[in-house]
Amino acid sequence: KITLQDNVTFSSGRAMDAEAVKQCLEHLLANHDRAAADTKIDSMEADGQVLTIHTSEPKPALLNYLGDPYGCIIDVDAGFDDGIVAGTGPYIATDCQSGDHLTLVKNENYWNGTPHIDELTIKTITDGNTLANALLSGEVQAAYGMAYESYPMFENDNFTFSQISTSRCFFLKMNFNEGSVCTDPAVRKAIAMGIDKEGFVENLLEGNGYPANGTFPAGSAFGGDKV
């Protein structure tokens, strides 16, 4: 059972109750194969602000799956043919041009306080050099996903870096099929010990990362000494 926050509305004006969330998830399951495979949701019941979800098999990580970007809760009745959806966040999309930009204005009825910025324009810039030049010239005020080789241009008092460890990682998959040498734990250990993770971070990532000992970063609830 999931109990939803009271007094939350979509930007369309519709109340975000269990029925609205149920409708959104039903649409998701019908149109997104990975979501259906991940969650194994079999049925749902809506009662006021309480949504009861039944799965076809035990799914202890269900909430984590629903936290995936595909699990964003929107007002399905409001439509999305123009690329704009009605959500419950601090900003409302007013213009969406795929591959070019997204314009957002602050949601005056946001349930968790008043946003500090009146309007945002998020631009799509796929070329790394173009992105770096846009930030240097002041064409954009912030950039995400900057190429590592561009970092030195911004290592001064005019710019601030914001970084955080995430579960996005580079990893090696081993073949566990019958007959594979990787079914031997000693072989797997030897392969793992032979990977220079520190060298990978320093040379391939130019120091912008850290050697991982699992899927989750040390600072997370499931990382480091916590497991």
Predicted regions and their residues:
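Ligand-binding "clamshell"
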Residues: D38-T39, P152-Q163
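Aromatic- and charge-enriched surface segment that lines or borders ligand/interaction sites
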Residues: K1-H32, V181-T183
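Structural transition elements
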Residues: P211-V227
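Gly/Pro-rich hinge or "lid" segments in bacterial periplasmic/extracellular proteins
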Residues: A61-P115, E119, N129
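Surface-exposed binding/hinge segments that line
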Residues: T3, A35-D77, Q97
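Alpha-helical secondary-structure segments
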Residues: D17-Q23, Q49-V50, P90, I117-E119, ...
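Ligand-site clamp/hinge motif
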Residues: N109-M153
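Periplasmic-binding protein-like
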Residues: T160-N175, G219-S220
